[in-house]
């Protein structure tokens, strides 16, 4: 079912619409759970073609969304997340191709063992069922979530942000075309066809048992609302208050390259670094060059007293800066006593998303990787690798920062659960 914008007359009509979407998605999930890998891949291949063929329509729809956002005074970071370019549309199509090429997780036997009574027990991957994805300004999430749920045998209900509705609708049309060509139900990938914010509340209620899990993808307030109000399980994608720690053993050239990429490659993504921590023993040699490099690249640096002393252009940091996801060309910077002090700071101010250490000393790096309690920890690499595509997942539905079921980039495999399959030869329990 392609999504056309619907005018809703009152809460009762909206509830009827949403519950109907839920029932259709539940029926589609039963079909997808039994679909062969070949049929799902045919749909993905058709979606890839449709995205490329429909690029002009997608970009035109996105231009309207961006124009509205500009007129409403959206900041540069928001506009970057909202904007599609020919390269980003092509990357969307390439991501679908990668997802098509990964092994189908459904039906995979992850463990198998035989009991003394002769029974064989297998642990087998199965779809979750119906996934609801609630997201804000990123139109590419429409494609990422749709194709990952399809690959993993799940139906999905997509509720994108009102600011990206036209873009999401154009992308969704391409996904539905792929489902059609492969003979799969169109309700397998459903886009909520209204901007009415009350639709979110209905999704959080689970649509009378139609929704099995909710994935929020957006700012702190959205995720907090979902976690507070959801009556079904949630894969929480929290904000990325990400750190790069520069150890006393760090190579300066490597540190400069990693810090610049981690902060400035794309400032509006959840994997961007937001705080720079520098070992006090490295401050004399590393601090000033790193700060100057960032400022010269157009990044505002907010630092403690030592960082301010290193460069007159540094602005004073407040307590709030250590807890802020800027999603902009701003970074907080602080000198810490050592790796232990860095770990304490990350524990107190981080969001359990992504944190990196730059160090040549293997023992220090191992300590950091072992003790920092984040979904992704990196040694001598940029935090911007916090991305499902970079993990080889093809795409991601989000970065889960909780500890249950899925953690880190949520790809097709993470969108499955399991059942136990037992083979006997007539055994009965004594």
Curated annotation (Swiss-Prot):
GO terms for molecular function: glutamate-5-semialdehyde dehydrogenase activity; NADP binding. The keyword Amino-acid biosynthesis applies. One of its GO terms (biological process) is L-proline biosynthetic process. One of its GO terms (cellular component) is cytoplasm. InterPro entries: Ald_DH/histidinol_DH (IPR016161), Ald_DH_C (IPR016163), Ald_DH_N (IPR016162), Aldehyde_DH_dom (IPR015590), G-glutamylP_reductase_CS (IPR020593), Glu-5-SA_DH (IPR012134), GPR_dom (IPR000965). It catalyses: L-glutamate 5-semialdehyde + phosphate + NADP(+) = L-glutamyl 5-phosphate + NADPH + H(+). Pathway: Amino-acid biosynthesis; L-proline biosynthesis; L-glutamate 5-semialdehyde from L-glutamate: step 2/2. It is found in: Cytoplasm. Its main location: cytoplasm. Its EC number is 1.2.1.41. Keywords: Amino-acid biosynthesis, Cytoplasm, NADP, Oxidoreductase, Proline biosynthesis. PANTHER family: DELTA-1-PYRROLINE-5-CARBOXYLATE SYNTHASE, GLUTAMATE SEMIALDEHYDE DEHYDROGENASE. HAMAP family: ProA. Catalyzes the NADPH-dependent reduction of L-glutamate 5-phosphate into L-glutamate 5-semialdehyde and phosphate. The product spontaneously undergoes cyclization to form 1-pyrroline-5-carboxylate. Belongs to the gamma-glutamyl phosphate reductase family. This is Gamma-glutamyl phosphate reductase. It comes from Rhodopseudomonas palustris (strain HaA2).
